[in-house]
A protein has these predicted regions:
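N-terminal Rossmann-like FAD-binding beta1-loop-alpha1 element of flavoenzymes
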Residues: 8-36
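Catalytic P-loop NTPase motifs of RecA-like helicase/translocase cores
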Residues: 20, 43-44, 144
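Feature captures the FAD/FMN-dependent oxidoreductase FAD-binding
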Residues: 76-142
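A short, basic/flexible loop-to-alpha-helix module at the beginning of a structural domain
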Residues: 1-8
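Short amphipathic alpha-helical segments
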Residues: 24-25, 48-49, 146-150
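Glycine-rich active-site loop/strand segments that organize a redox cofactor
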Residues: 48-90
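Glycine-rich FAD pyrophosphate-binding loop
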Residues: 27-52
């Protein structure tokens, strides 16, 4: 049996705290065969997407950061959205993640290929990317995709 080599060992989806944190952890572990797929044109997740008046974190700033990258420069106890977004941009650059991030790649499907033991991710841009592992860092504010299971709509 011929095995197909995946494009990457790991695909991370999203560039909020979860996705960037995973990317940093992979680099620290010496795993460099990974990509981070991001639907938008910049990092930041919810802190990039939400910018209404008064948008801020409801967790104290010193706790709302990576333990390995404290930010002593928060201007308020509860950081405003622009500062959090800037912090995430700083982390992505400082830890060398920018080359691994593929912007404009919204994942529409993730299908596990049993025969080849790899994941096939399909993006809205029509790209197919393969990996051995997938880590979702899309967060709770993303639109969920429900499986097409017979009887799902009538289940009580």
């Amino acid at each position: 049996m011929t095995t197909i080599s995946p494009d990457y060992q790991v695909i991370v989806v999203g560039t909020g705290f979860s996705g960037l944190g995973m990317g940093i952890a992979l680099k620290k572990a010496g795993i460099n065969s990974f990509a981070i797929l991001e639907k938008a044109d910049d990092v930041g997740g919810t802190w990039r997407d939400n910018h209404y008046p008064g948008c801020a974190c409801d967790v104290q700033s010193h706790l709302y950061s990576f333990s390995f990258e404290p930010n002593p420069s928060w201007t308020r106890m509860y950081a405003p959205q622009p500062e959090i977004k800037k912090y995430l941009q700083h982390c992505a650059r400082k830890y060398g993640l920018m080359p691994q991030i593929q912007f404009g790649q919204e994942v529409k499907k993730a299908i596990y290929d049993e025969q080849n033991k790899l994941w096939r991710l399909e993006t809205a841009a029509g790209k197919t990317i393969t990996s051995r592992m997938v880590v979702s860092g899309m967060g709770g504010l993303s639109t969920a995709a429900y499986p097409n299971i017979k009887g799902l709509n009538t289940f009580k």
